[in-house]
Amino acid sequence: MNINVADLLNGNYILLLFVVLALGLCLGKLRLGSVQLGNSIGVLVVSLLLGQQHFSINTDALNLGFMLFIFCVGVEAGPNFFSIFFRDGKNYLMLALVMVGSALLIALGLGKLFGWDIGLTVGMLAGSMTSTPVLVGAGDTLRHSGIASTQLSSALDNLSLGYALTYLIGLVSLIVGARYLPKLQHQDLQTSAQQIARERGLDTDANRKVYLPVIRAYRVGPELVAWTDGKNLRELGIYRQTGCYIERIRRNGILANPDGDAVLQMGDEIALVGYPDAHARLDPSFRNGKEVFDRDLLDMRIVTEEIVVKNHNAVGRRLAQLKLTDHGCFLNRVIRSQIEMPIDDNVVLNKGDVLQVSGDARRVKTIADRIGFISIHSQVTDLLAFCAFFIIGLMIGMITFQFSNFSFGIGNAAGLLFAGIMLGFLRANHPTFGYIPQGALNMVKEFGLMVFMAGVGLSAGSGISNGLGAVGGQMLIAGLVVSLVPVVICFLFGAYVLRMNRALLFGAMMGARTCAPAMEIISDTARSNIPALGYAGTYAIANVLLTLAGTLIVIIWPGLG
């Protein structure tokens, strides 16, 4: 039996789509030196090559892909978006505005200088900024702009062409810039990180190992009684000295949970909870042959839970004010916008932050009720909320504003982004509403993006050869300028206007570019995860601004002449 592969793919859009995705994902795993191509560029390259052979898919698949992607971007940004917008994230908001605004203005200027159309200009902006939200926002606005079908087809083709030609330029140049810009500016990020660590009491070890606390029990003998000298537990300050916490006392056969006024007596059996190194710091009078192995005394259920910060008595407060250790709980991690933060007593908690806490199950539950709620460890997505807010986003996107003879619509991209932000925000405030496991959210977002990239590549592939020959050199120059000049402007603004700590500033700059690989370079240079504070501060707002930038550039382009 002979199978004509070309006819088979042309006759089955679904098969063609998944062939493009599979081949593109394989290509995306390749590395050029230390830089991995990535899934987006892999799928785009394969789809462009197949598009040259006149393969195509239904545009409905492309539209659904971008809708899923942009909605999930909003859901991820939602928990922290409003706290960054309205509170102490003013500096981060301003940095993101400077980064996105300067890139937008430079792209507009270069587009007019080289005589490009709107498609090439926006594609170059999206690729140079390695920002798919720009591409998605612009593509949706173009489709609803009312321009002639031939112009629309050309603009959409050039959109993906500009993105494909400048994406690697933007990615590689930013990674190189992240490595060498601190040196060119004579900035010692390691010293800056250590400086802010001393000021705030941060843990500067980016690779800090996390252990579960362990339970050990000891019998109080004459040496320990002499060591306590009649002081109560509060006066002894065992936790302050060692990091261990007395969880239980058995006295005369009765188990009890002690308070700070308890005084140790001869014959007491005490259960201490702490990390392994904390037990090693105990005074020798605890350990000298007096360890007790008793099921009832040691029978505590130590759990590790992820607590989502929600309640007003925790939001806006410093981490130290929670006094977790006073309640027998141990903090392992602080996570904001999926970025692990340094454990810093002076970190101000935002709504939606996640604290990974270990301790006795009862105590952890008490802490969770006080500051928020325990993240649901369910693998079931609230599909009803997902679909309802998706519908709301589409309806918002249908709104059109009319000014005299000029009209413009909000568009699906902005509508879905707003609806996603609201769903994410409500999820951070109501533990049983709108739950989407992070793995499921990542999968839907990535799948939507890959479908969108496959669609734009297949539709633009037939004209890539002519386009490359006509604008290839110009694209190289423009890509480098748009990728690096806004970073330099952002650095100057943050350093000399906002006067930010350099380690935080460089992290915030990478967050404003939404570039995780460059963030890793900055953390390695600083030998600290302190820059993650800055990255998390700008990342969520930058994703939103970049989507709006793609919409805005299409709206204002006709008025520039």
UniProtKB/Swiss-Prot annotation:
Q: Which residues form the RCK C-terminal domain?
A: 200-288, 292-373
Q: What is the lineage of its organism?
A: Bacteria, Pseudomonadati, Pseudomonadota, Gammaproteobacteria, Enterobacterales
Question: Molecular function terms in GO for this entry?
Answer: monoatomic cation transmembrane transporter activity
Q: Which Gene3D superfamilies match?
A: Regulator of K+ conductance, C-terminal domain
NAD among keywords: no
Q: What is this protein called?
A: Putative transport protein YbjL
Q: Which organism is it from?
A: Salmonella dublin (strain CT_02021853)
* UniProt keyword annotation of Manganese present: no
PROSITE patterns registered for this protein in UniProt: RCK_C (PS51202)
